[in-house]
């Protein structure tokens, strides 16, 4: 049973697709941009009263590309008001 769950997860796993804005091997900027895009989208949709689920694509991409420690640090910085990005 557990083996089937793992196989299903592997089969359904999707990583970040190619983005022509970031053609180089180093994907740091891609990670950063998708993190910002997710939170900008979430903020805009919340303000307009729209469906926030349309922003999930950005979240999946940055979670696929970014190291967990970076995301944790950025989330803490946003909570403290010291995040350097413009959201």
Curated annotation (Swiss-Prot):
Lineage: superkingdom: Eukaryota
Domain CHCH: 28-74
Localization in the cell: Mitochondrion intermembrane space
Motif Cx10C motif boundaries: 55-66
InterPro entries: COX6B-like, CX6/COA6-like_sf, Cyt_c_oxidase_su6B
One of the record's GO cellular component terms: mitochondrion
Swiss-Prot/TrEMBL keywords: Disulfide bond, Mitochondrion
PROSITE patterns listed in its UniProt record: CHCH
Cysteine-cysteine disulfides: 31-66, 41-55
Presence of keyword Nucleotide-binding: no
Sequence motif Cx9C motif, location on chain: 31-41
Its job: Connects the two COX monomers into the physiological dimeric form.
PANTHER family found in the cross-reference section: CYTOCHROME C OXIDASE SUBUNIT 6B
The protein's name: Cytochrome c oxidase subunit 6B1
Phylogenetic placement of the source organism: Eukaryota, Metazoa, Chordata, Craniata, Vertebrata
Gene that encodes the chain: COX6B1
